[in-house]
Amino acid sequence: MKLKGEAVLITGGASGLGRALVDRFVAEAKVAVLDKSAERLAELETDLGDNVLGIVGDVRSLEDQKQAASRCVARFGKIDTLIPNAGIWDYSTALVDLPEESLDAAFDEVFHINVKGYIHAVKALPALVASRGNVIFTISNAGFYPNGGGPLYTAAKQAIVGLVRELAFELAPYVRVNGVGPGGMNSDMRGPSSLGMGSKAISTVPLADMLKSVLPIGRMPEVEEYTGAYVFFATRGDAAPASGALVNYDGGLGVRGFFSGAGGNDLLEQLNIHP
């Protein structure tokens, strides 16, 4: 029970990875969730009870972020961990495929949600300094490698890599700042409305089939499997030395081979192991 008595604020926590994080943290901690969907927040509170506080708001609004922080402190007395997680994906729309008439609006939408929303979340939380807390940014494999999105999403996520490092410096020694880069997952993450993708969810893309032969671990992880790295960084004792750390938590994308996703596909046969 390393997180017992802790209070956590998660943005974009009513679906997808955010919901999985809420479910994981609420087993020990109190959790506040900022999300735009009042309906999903109501479901969350019904499912998880008094240990969860749902707050309707837009991560692009600093006032909404400040209100979320204020309500979390009013309800739970403090904030120990902030997880800026809300985001949208550009569905790997290449630069040549971005319509000129939509480019400016799409850029603003992706960066306002995926970057400005993260900056607002931290700006709204001087309470983290008081609690000597920590920030855990959700990045993406696109923060480290190409082809995890189009240029808009990739640029936004690589901006968060820089943000982790800068804020880890600026907020030291009082607040630890780290980042987790999950890989592909089956979630409800949407696309930019400015590109006509506002109602499109990642779950409609056959990612599991696409990634099976690409990832060294041989499969696409379940959403819940990504939550462990966040729990580690949030745990004061285990992660006390960690600040400015970036974890590629993506099924081994960085070690895939030229001709095969995994080099040990024949190990069982070679070692005469029969599971």
UniProtKB/Swiss-Prot annotation:
UniProt-listed Enzyme Commission number(s): 1.3.1.56
InterPro entries, per database record: BphB-like_SDR (IPR047950), BphB_TodD (IPR017711), NAD(P)-bd_dom_sf (IPR036291), Sc_DH/Rdtase_CS (IPR020904), SDR_fam (IPR002347)
Residues binding NAD(+): 9-33
Positions annotated to bind substrate: S140
Pathway in which the depicted protein is active: Xenobiotic degradation; biphenyl degradation; 2-hydroxy-2,4-pentadienoate and benzoate from biphenyl: step 2/4
Listed GO biological process terms: catabolic process
Uppermost EC category: oxidoreductase
Active-site residue list: Y153 (proton acceptor)
Reactions catalysed according to its record: (2R,3S)-3-phenylcyclohexa-3,5-diene-1,2-diol + NAD(+) = biphenyl-2,3-diol + NADH + H(+)
Bridged cysteine pairs (disulfide): none
GO molecular function, one term: cis-2,3-dihydrobiphenyl-2,3-diol dehydrogenase activity
Keywords (A to Z) from UniProt: Aromatic hydrocarbons catabolism, NAD, Oxidoreductase
Iron among keywords: no
Record-linked Pfam families: adh_short
Alphabetical list of PANTHER family matching this protein: BENZIL REDUCTASE, CHAIN DEHYDROGENASE, PUTATIVE (AFU_ORTHOLOGUE AFUA_4G08710)-RELATED
Family membership: Belongs to the short-chain dehydrogenases/reductases (SDR) family.
Protein name: Cis-2,3-dihydrobiphenyl-2,3-diol dehydrogenase
Source organism: Metapseudomonas furukawaii (Pseudomonas furukawaii)
Gene giving rise to this polypeptide: bphB
